[in-house]
Amino acid sequence: MSVSAFNRRWAAVILEALTRHGVRHICIAPGSRSTPLTLAAAENSAFIHHTHFDERGLGHLALGLAKVSKQPVAVIVTSGTAVANLYPALIEAGLTGEKLILLTADRPPELIDCGANQAIRQPGMFASHPTHSISLPRPTQDIPARWLVSTIDHALGTLHAGGVHINCPFAEPLYGEMDDTGLSWQQRLGDWWQDDKPWLREAPRLESEKQRDWFFWRQKRGVVVAGRMSAEEGKKVALWAQTLGWPLIGDVLSQTGQPLPCADLWLGNAKATSELQQAQIVVQLGSSLTGKRLLQWQASCEPEEYWIVDDIEGRLDPAHHRGRRLIANIADWLELHPAEKRQPWCVEIPRLAEQAMQAVIARRDAFGEAQLAHRISDYLPEQGQLFVGNSLVVRLIDALSQLPAGYPVYSNRGASGIDGLLSTAAGVQRASGKPTLAIVGDLSALYDLNALALLRQVSAPLVLIVVNNNGGQIFSLLPTPQSERERFYLMPQNVHFEHAAAMFELKYHHPQNWQELETAFADAWRTPTTTVIEMVVNDTDGAQTLQQLLAQVSHL
């Protein structure tokens, strides 16, 4: 009997089961203990294979692939700390709804807690963050293949969002020629191998339910808050709100076109919040709101009803409003709750939004990060997509820009970490095949610098803008102690990225003005390669510009 051969047959059942649940992309890191899984994945023609030497980046690559494909994405890693490196991506997926299938190779039980190399306690190591966790036994023919496949099917068939951790122990030998060991065990699944459906099929979730009193509420004064959603949903939400005559406050990830732009500026004006107090109902579509003033207003508003519609389960309301948590696909929910044509009830807010945008435009000439945030829509590639980093850059774009309705925007706004942003952007590009503009800060780029290796493999032009303000300048917006701000919060690194781009053979530009930036973009969009554009700006100008605009708009 060949242990290595049966390990591979066991792994082949697992991998084939994944294909029945829509898994097409599979991300693989190097490792020996994961050999059965890796070889089974390599032999399965249903998969598109992605590789990376860094497991943390690999997890975020899978996250980006899942964001665009809307399908589960599998990850294969070896045992030990390689597994722990998947934690950040798993946490993010749990908060933003992407489906990740983590296949973690492990030592067999007799090698745990006895000093064996690269052997740690992997079952349960992700605590409550996976939606499902499976600790498989050591491969053995004593367990029927139908148990293995139905176990996988149950976890994936009931997975609506987040990650599944499947821990897979394998005993040595891991290498060797294939023989007939376990062939009859595998063949007991019969014509399942020729089929394309799961062995065990779970009943789907109930469809969205119509709120029977919607006809009553749609005649009231309402406000629509749009959070993270798809591009198609964003366009539908914008039309829905316009028909109702309700003001739409659109987040940077809403893709609604933000018909009332610069919301994070005008929400600081007492006239706006006073008018919003007249709202009888607030309908929030999508979660993960970005703007500070929006979150402050959302926490303080007290309408008669506050509805939150999102496909992700959970409360999603840190302000704990009285109202309804409606778990539904946004587009489906809109169809069940049609808008009735009514005149807009807000008068002051459209005027304030226009004045706020004019205040931003008046400052657009200076070469800085706030101005770049405002101008970002000018640089979007046609038929492309935008990936926005975290920290200061996403807040500036949210507050100062107006993105086109229906233009795809992606980000990691669940846990909002700066880890893995370049890797996620790589996954977003690979899954879509579209020209991509990604924008991050210098610390975010440093954090995930080795992901530049992933950006060597793109199928369409990708431009990575690194806004180098020399540190974590978001802390300039916070009341951090002035005496310790630089040492313990900003942490300036005094680095430039030209040599990093050269190390990975990526094109590089360092524009000094808007004309040079436009020339760099024109060059970058010509070829299906990655271009790094480093925009060096004065350290605190972006934060100061935002603060000045907030003060100005608050007194309009």
From Swiss-Prot:
InterPro entries, per the entry: MenaQ_synth_MenD, MenD_middle, THDP-binding, Thiamin_PyroP_enz_TPP-bd_dom, TPP_enzyme_TPP-bd
Gene Ontology terms describing biological process: menaquinone biosynthetic process
Domain of life (superkingdom): Bacteria
Protein name, UniProt field: 2-succinyl-5-enolpyruvyl-6-hydroxy-3-cyclohexene-1-carboxylate synthase
Catalytic activity: isochorismate + 2-oxoglutarate + H(+) = 5-enolpyruvoyl-6-hydroxy-2-succinyl-cyclohex-3-ene-1-carboxylate + CO2
Single GO molecular function: thiamine pyrophosphate binding
Keywords tagged on the record: Magnesium, Manganese, Menaquinone biosynthesis, Metal-binding, Thiamine pyrophosphate, Transferase
E.C. designation(s): 2.2.1.9
Family annotation (PANTHER family): 2-SUCCINYL-5-ENOLPYRUVYL-6-HYDROXY-3-CYCLOHEXENE-1-CARBOXYLATE SYNTHASE, PROTEIN PHYLLO, CHLOROPLASTIC
Names of required cofactors: Mg(2+); Mn(2+); thiamine diphosphate
Species for this entry: Shigella flexneri
Record text on cofactor binding: Binds 1 thiamine pyrophosphate per subunit.
Coiled-coil annotated residue ranges, if any: none
Function (record text): Catalyzes the thiamine diphosphate-dependent decarboxylation of 2-oxoglutarate and the subsequent addition of the resulting succinic semialdehyde-thiamine pyrophosphate anion to isochorismate to yield 2-succinyl-5-enolpyruvyl-6-hydroxy-3-cyclohexene-1-carboxylate (SEPHCHC).
Cytoplasm recorded as keyword: no
